[in-house]
Amino acid sequence: MSMTETIKLYDRDAYAIEFEADIISCEPNKADDKQFDIILNQTLFFPEEGGQSPDMGILGGYSVVDVQIKNGVITHTVDISAGDCCEAEKEAGKQITGNEFEPEKVELAAGVHVCGKIDWQHRFYNMQQHSGEHIFSGIVHRRFGFENVGFHLSDSVVTMDFSGVISPEDIAEVEHEVNVAISKNIPIEVTYPSRDELAQLEYRSKIEIEGQVRIVTVPGYDVCACCAPHVKRTGEIGMLKVMNYQNYKGGVRISILCGFRALEAFRQKRDIISELMGI
């Protein structure tokens, strides 16, 4: 049976935290009998897609541990083991409301109306990373003509694979230019051009995409097809820091961190140095 595509509420508002939806399908997870795979009519949960890790949060009072998309249908995997997810639920609720939060669990079955809440900190940190990566990749493409041929955004690092070698000096210059763009607090634009408009548009990631193409533009720096949530202005990225780089498959692999994740990485480095120095 074919399933109707899930309505992507995160496309409409990347800053929304709570939503309501109807369960279309609820099936036991084949790998774990304490988990269920749920399909909703609409969702705020961004799935693992385009190299980015999925949103986490709460659905129907249970922890969402994975979100996947196939043929436009988004599947949420929830953990129903109370002992395993209780603390995670409370913490996610505290991040959302600022208060201690006891989620109300509901029956998980087709036809049931449920409430969902995304883990906002996780979502926003991912938005910072992805928007920073767009600016970095756009500058590399403009200056050197190289394509971003590999991208991965995890909870600990962002890696980008470029189609040509970039010297350490040039990488440092790109890093500086990205942070200049961040300091300008430029509005980031999301548009849905028609096929005719798209044919006339110069943008990165120009691959065959079925259906409506979503274009994310950082004026003066990057125009790229992208499905992920982004910050509204470059200033929200905070900062970008190159963490590592190495020659890779005839090009270069560059690792970066942005915003709060970059700050946390440098706090950890400071703590290590302080411990080694006996401070």
Regions found by a protein language model. Give the residues of each.
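A glycine- and charged-residue-rich anion-binding loop/surface
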Residues: 1-279
